[in-house]
């Protein structure tokens, strides 16, 4: 029997499980997002199946790309557990977090090449705003190899009721 899926706000005590279950290499992303959460800039969300992390997302309280809404970003579900409702659960939890702070909507930025993620967001009711932005970043794979990426992001939003 598969353990139930839950999503909650990350805590500092989750760091060892996150590093083991969803390694980020030299980026140390989990620690960085927890620090930004402590500073009030973001809310770091983690999906769990039992005691194993199976996905993450970040609610940035200042939207990018001209959005007046907070933005769900860095949504990641590893390929072996995709198509199991994890991404959807993280999105819905992010919406609840935004609502609990009195926000009227939520934005999601999606790389123009990520057709699968865009289809998910659109199925969930998110609408393309026509706003675009470009961002570059560096990440490290599990072997420590450096990768430079540039994303061309389109902004989708959902008004929260």
Question: Which ranges hold each PLM region?
Answer:
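Short glycine/proline-centered loop/turn elements that form peptide/ligand docking sites
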Residues: 87, 91, 113-117, 133-140
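Short hydrophobic/aromatic beta-strand or adjacent loop that forms the aromatic wall/cage
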Residues: 42, 149-156
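Active-site acidic-Proline motif in GNAT/NAT acetyltransferases
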Residues: 78-80, 84, 112-113
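Conserved GNAT acetyl-CoA-binding A-motif
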Residues: 98-109
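Conserved acyl-donor/pantetheine-binding loop and adjacent beta-alpha core of acyl/acetyltransferases
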Residues: 56-69, 134-149
